[in-house]
Amino acid sequence: MPGAGTFKLFIGNLDEKTQATELRALFEKYGTVVECDVVKNYGFVHMETEQQGRDAIQNLNGYTLNEFAIKVEAAKSRRAPNTPTTKIFVGNLTDKTRAPEVRELFQKYGTVVECDIVRNYGFVHLDCVGDVQDAIKELNGRVVDGQPLKVQVSTSRVRPKPGMGDPEQCYRCGRSGHWSKECPRLYGSAGGGREPPSPLSAGGYRDRMYGRDPYPPPPPPPPFLRDRIMDGFRDYDYYDRRFEDSRDLYERRYQTSRMRDFPPPPISRREPMPLPPTLSGSLRSCSVSRGYDTMFSRRSPPPPRSSNGMSRYGSPTPHGYEDFSRDAFDERMISSRGMRGPSPPGRRYAPY
C-alpha cells in the first residue's frame, strides 16, 4: 500500500489492452514505482518522491504506448484540498507545439501543477509559490515554433461539463433552480428574448409531463356576430313588449285585437276590472274602459219574455240558449275598433 509521502500520477488515454506490468516498466526508468493500477483506459502510478514524479511527467506526457499518446499528469485528490495555483493562458500556439515544450518553459518560474494544450492555445497551472508575474513578463511574445506566444493570466472560470454536475442542476448551464427546458440560454436572457415559462403557471407541470404546449384559447367572435348571437338568447315577454313602447292607446288596442290567440296576462299584471257600464241604444252609449280585455264580450240581460213565449223579435226562444241583443254586438265591434266615449247614465245589468 502506498505511503503518505508518495507522489501520485494520473495516466490517461490508454489502450484497453495495456497491462499494469507494461506501465510499471515504463515509469521505473525515472524512479521507484510504489504502486501501479490500470482501470480500463486510464491508470494511476505512485512514485516514491515528488521529483521522480515530475521527471516522469516531463518525459512521458504525450508518449506513444500501443499506438496511443498517453497523458501523464499529477493526480488530484478529491479528499485533500487542492494546491492553490494560478491559471495562465498561453495562446497563438502552432499545431506542432506539444504540452511538454510548454511545461518546460514555465518550470523555470515554479512548480507546474498542470499543463493542457487545446488546439492552438493552452493553459498552465503554476504554483502560487512561483513567480507568476516574471513568467508572464518574460514568456509573453517569445517565439515558439515560428510564432510569438501570448501569455497572460486566465480570466475563464472552471465550469463542469454539461450533465456531469449535480443531478439537481441544469445540464445546460450547470445552475440549480430551474429545469433544463426552462434554461435562460434557450430564451436569450441577454438579448431581450421571451421569458421562460414559470413552473407554477397554468399548464406548467402538464407541459413538463407531456412535453407539449397547451392549446391557446379561441379568439372572441366579431362584435356584430356576438350581438346577433346574444339577441337570440334575450328573453322578451309579449306583455313587456306590449307596454314598453310609447304608442298611443289606439295602436296598443289594435295590436291586442290582432293577437287574441295569446292567453290573458297573469293576474298580478292585470288592472282591476271596472264596473260594468250602463247600456244605451245609441252608439255613443258604449264605454271602453282602459285595460279591459276585448277577448271577453259583454252580453245584454235577457229581454222580458212575453206571455206566449215569443222574443221581442217575434221568434220563439228555445230553452237552453240565451239571447244576445244587437247592442252587445255593436259594443263588441266598437271595442275592437278602439272607439272611445263616455257612457251616459242609464240602466245597468239586471240581476241574474
UniProtKB/Swiss-Prot annotation:
Summary of the tissues where the protein is detected: Expressed in the CNS and in CCAP neurons of the ventral nervous system (VNS), which control insect ecdysis.
Record-annotated RRM domain positions: 7-77, 86-156
Zn-finger (CCHC-type) residues: 168-185
Induction description: Oscillates in abundance during the circadian cycle at the protein level; peaks during the subjective day.
PROSITE patterns for the chain: RRM (PS50102), ZF_CCHC (PS50158)
Entry keyword set: Biological rhythms, Cytoplasm, Metal-binding, Nucleus, Phosphoprotein, Repeat, RNA-binding, Zinc, Zinc-finger
GO molecular function: mRNA binding; RNA binding; zinc ion binding
Biased composition (Polar residues): 279-288
Biased composition (Basic and acidic residues): 320-334
InterPro entries attached to this UniProt entry: Euk_RNA-bind_prot, Nucleotide-bd_a/b_plait_sf, RBD_domain_sf, RRM_dom, Znf_CCHC
SMART domains per UniProt: RRM, ZnF_C2HC
Region Disordered, annotated ranges: 187-228, 254-352
Superkingdom per UniProt: Eukaryota
Chief location category: cytoplasm
Localization of this protein: Cytoplasm; Nucleus
CDD domains assigned to the protein according to its UniProt record, in alphabetical order: RRM1_2_CoAA_like (cd12343)
GO biological process assignments: actin cytoskeleton organization; circadian rhythm; eclosion; eclosion rhythm; embryo development ending in birth or egg hatching; locomotor rhythm; mitotic cell cycle; mRNA splicing, via spliceosome
GO CC terms of this entry: catalytic step 2 spliceosome; cytoplasm; nuclear speck; nucleus; precatalytic spliceosome
Annotated positions of the Phosphoserine modification: S198, S201, S315, S325
Function: Essential RNA-binding protein. May be required for circadian repression of eclosion. Also essential for nurse cell dumping during oogenesis, the process whereby the cytoplasmic contents of nurse cells are transferred to the oocyte late in it's development.
Protein name according to UniProt: RNA-binding protein lark
